[in-house]
Design a protein with these regions (language model features):
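Pol beta-like nucleotidyltransferase catalytic core
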Residues: 1-61, 65-155, 160-177, 181-262
Length: 262
């Protein structure tokens, strides 16, 4: 694995793409002569082109275009060189997926919840946010905090800090989930963590989210969104379906292995 996107493990090897999770099928190492292939993450595109490593090379784009601007454009501008270097390019970006068979879809993130299930609900609605302002999505999220923060239980860095996301989701029927960007096929743990706790997301993000999950189990975030205990339990079939769909995306390494290597 080339790139510092993932957390380092205490044994000196790399961690995994999803916070607190390990893959069932893939083990990342820094350097190993028997490695079956090398993955290059995000901005390490040029490392793979010029480092002389043997064996198959794969490029994996995890971050959104709002956090890592210019990555997709760089690949499009150097399409032939990238395709000659990499066996497969894994991405959630539709501009790349439209370029051909070398480009394979992977969710932008898995989920962080340790035990995915439908938890007993005792509270109405929460929101997990932070005070970061690195991109448009951060600013938009803070705008919604200002508008509706007094109507829900607010958690996150700079607000009511919590050790684990379960604290802000498990007890709640609904939770506001706002992605860092609003474009097709881009969704992250902000959405999947809701599904993994049986919580209905009040969502602002991928406009095509209904192509991936049961839209009846998602409420669009608007100025007039409505939540109630009656609404929650009327959507239980969709809640169960979205939980099962989310489980398939829990750890991205496992998603990649099952879909593209098995």
């Amino acid at each position: 694995l080339v790139g510092d996107t993932f957390t380092h493990l205490t044994n000196g090897n790399k961690g995994y793409s999803v916070h607190g999770k390990e893959s069932k099928y893939i083990k990342w190492v820094k350097d190993h002569p028997l490695a079956e292939g090398t993955f290059y993450i995000d901005n390490t595109i040029n490392d793979g082109i010029g480092d002389g490593r043997k064996g198959l090379k794969y490029l994996w784009l995890l971050e959104s275009k709002h956090i890592k601007p210019g990555m997709v454009e760089s690949i499009i501008d150097n399409k032939q060189l990238v395709e000659d270097t990499y066996e497969t390019i894994f991405t959630h970006d539709q501009r790349l997926l439209a370029l051909g068979d070398k480009y394979k879809w992977v969710p932008a993130q898995g989920f962080w919840i340790k035990e995915p299930k439908i938890y007993e609900k005792t509270k109405m609605i929460s929101m997990i946010a932070s005070n970061k302002r690195m991109c448009e999505g951060h600013v938009k999220r803070l705008g919604w905090v200002e508008r509706i923060g007094d109507q829900l239980d607010l958690y996150g860095r700079g607000f009511n800090e919590i050790a684990d996301k379960e604290e802000g989701l498990c007890d709640y029927m609904f939770s506001v989930a706002i992605e860092n960007g609003e474009y097709e096929t881009y969704f992250t743990e902000k959405l999947l963590d809701c599904f993994a706790t049986g919580t209905i997301p009040v969502y602002l993000g991928a406009p095509d989210i209904g192509d991936h999950f049961n839209k009846d189990g998602i409420i669009d975030l608007t100025e007039e969104f409505e939540v109630s205990e009656e609404i929650y339990y009327s959507k239980m079939d969709a809640i169960k379906e979205n939980l099962e769909k989310a489980k398939e995306m829990e750890v991205l390494e496992d998603f990649i292995y099952r879909r593209y290597f098995q």
